[in-house]
A protein has these predicted regions:
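Arg/Lys-rich, positively charged N-terminal/basic patches that mediate binding to nucleic acids
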Residues: 1-32, 100
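Short, flexible helix/strand-to-coil boundary loops that buttress conserved ligand/catalytic motifs
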Residues: 17-20, 46, 82-84, 94
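Generic structural signal for secondary-structure transition and capping sites
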Residues: 18, 25, 40, 44-47, ...
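Basic/aromatic recognition patch in beta-strand/loop cores that engages polyanionic ligands
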Residues: 37, 44-78
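Enriched for short, Lys/Arg-rich terminal
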Residues: 68, 72-102
Length: 102
């Protein structure tokens, strides 16, 4: 499975790393590496995440972090949609589909 990051997901990862770097650059690097490693693992085990709150998606809760990675599988592609903090309010629309509120 080939992992493809959406522009939104790339921006989220970059923004969260910049935010954490202001207080603790080492922690920012560790968190980013943990997220990247978790997503790389999805290439081997694409169904590792739980069913997503949007039909047709899955969500990976990144171990040892408060982050959740929504993604979807399309043939031999795994598309990373975004990177969200677990306490963050999700947008009302995600890839053109209305996101239900928990």
């Amino acid at each position: 499975v080939t992992v493809i990051w959406s522009p939104r997901a790339i921006r989220h990862l970059s923004d969260l790393r910049a935010y954490i770097t202001r207080e603790n650059p080492d922690a920012a690097a560790r968190v980013a590496l943990t997220i990247l490693t978790a997503v790389d693992r999805l290439a081997e085990f694409p169904n590792l995440g739980r069913p997503g709150r949007v039909t047709g998606t899955r969500e990976l809760v990144v171990p040892d972090t408060p982050y959740v990675i929504p993604y979807r599988l399309r043939a031999e592609r795994l598309e990373v949609i975004a990177v969200f903090h677990g306490r963050q309010r999700w947008p009302t629309r995600l890839w053109g589909v209305t996101t239900p509120r928990p």
